[in-house]
Each structure stands twice: as C-alpha cells, then as structure tokens.
Amino acid sequence: SPENAILYLKTLLAKHPYIKFINFRDAIFNMFPDWFDKFIDMYKKEIGLPCTGNIRFDILTEETVKKMKDAGFYTIDMGLESGDQEMRFKYLRRYQTDEMIINCSKWFNKYGIAQLTYNIIGLPYEDIHRALKTIKLNARIKSDRTIPNIFYPYEGTPLYEISKEAGFIPEGDFTQRRVPLVQPQFPEEQVLFIEAYFMHFVKRYKWAYAMPPKLGKIYEKWLDHRVTGKQVPYKFLVWWHDRYSDARNHLKDFLVNRMPKLYVKLRMIKHHKRAQKTD
C-alpha cells in the first residue's frame, strides 16, 4: 500500500540520513494510477526528496505529471523502444502512437521534468531508416538523456521466434556477438553506428526542429544524409567511437580505484545539476 511504502522510506531515511535523492527502480512505477496518485500525495507531504522513476506513457495524465513535479520528481525514465510506430505495434506490442508519446512529453517539458528514454536498436526487420525514426522521435520529445540498447533475442520470447523464422539468428553461439541478429537490410556496422552516435544525432535533430521551418528542413535533410548516406564510413566511425569509449572507461576506472572520493563527489555534482536544471 502507499502507506507501507512511505513507512519503509521513513525507516530507510532514519537509518541513512545522508540520502539526498531517491531512485525508484520499479519496472513501471505508475502501473496502478490510483495507487500512484495517492503515493505521490503522501510522498510530497512526508518525504519530499528529489526522485526519479520508470513511467509508462499510455496511463499518464497531465494532472499526474504536475503532481510528480510538486512531489520532487526531477527525471523520469521511460521505454520508448522504437520511433517507428509499425515496429512498436507489430513486434513490440506497445500500442502507443507517436502523437500519444509526443503529447505526454509536452507535459514533462511544461513542468520541467527531464526525460530519459530506453531505446532498442537492431530489432527484427528494422533497417537504418527505421532506426533513424527512433532518433528523430527522441529529438521531437526533447529527450534529455537516451540509452540505446542493441536487441538480443531471448529464447522463448515471441521476438526470438520471429527472428528465428526469418533466418536472422546465425548458426552456433551468437551470445558473444555485439549484434546478435544477422540482417541483410541492417548490417552490423550500421547497428553499431546508430548505437554509438545515438545521442549525438538526437541533439542535432533537436537543433533542426528548433530552427525556423525552412532552415530546419534543410538541416534535417543534411543530417539524414549523414546517417543514411551511401558514403557514410560506418566501420571507421564505429572503430573511432570504440577507441574513445575505451579511453573514457580507463579514466573512470582510475578515478574509482585511485580517487574514489573525487569520483563520488563528481557523481553527486552531476545529479545535483540535473535536479537543479528542472527546477
């Protein structure tokens, strides 16, 4: 019940008074709207710490989003998965239209709640043009952070069977492959390219959509060519990004192991900036 959840949080905070924000990792925090609305009201009155949580688009209302902001939500996580409506309906069984997603995102932008989206790249029958729709939808809803994940066909799931019947699952052990599916219309280097440069292009399409219409259309077409053009050096760009990621990870490991206090301080500054950004 909401009462028990609040009691648990109070007990936790009494034992750990240094906690400055809370990240609710419930898979779908607003699955039961009545429960969620009551919890938010109690959380605002009795806890009031900045917080984040996982949210579904199709069971939200503007009033709930406003309550979330008032209660201390500064970021929400949501599964966008694919920007191609047909892919969402046919393969993911997520019956959320583009219009529904865009309208909900307007509420988060209106009340100053940052958006983090989870996205899937390399779904069966996807190609780079459909993947680009995912980038563009993130730009249209003004996602603040994005997490692109490469699709993995878990045995026993409908998408595994679809992939197997289509011949996209290679023979032998595919678990160590960076891109598990082998699809002629969406080769490995293109999947890795989209994953690596996902947020880079989301930011640039945001610029395009913020420009005057005519100029924005020209810039958008230029960006389209940079993503899907026949002369894009996908393999080289993936190799370059891999080197950059390796260097960044080495620096992170160094800070964690040699300068842990500095690392924790930097993490806290990062979270506080995100919270302040949405105030």
Which residues are covered by each model-predicted region?
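Radical SAM [4Fe-4S] cluster-binding motif and immediate context
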Residues: 1-118, 136
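Histidine/acidic-residue-rich catalytic or RNA/ligand-binding cores of hydrolases
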Residues: 36, 131, 160-161
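Conserved strand-turn element in the central/C-terminal portion of the radical SAM core barrel
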Residues: 56, 83-92, 105-130, 149-155, ...
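Catalytic cores of alpha/beta
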Residues: 64-66, 124-140
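Radical SAM enzyme core and accessory elements
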Residues: 158, 175-279
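Aromatic- and acidic-residue-enriched segments that line the glycan-binding/catalytic groove
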Residues: 158-172
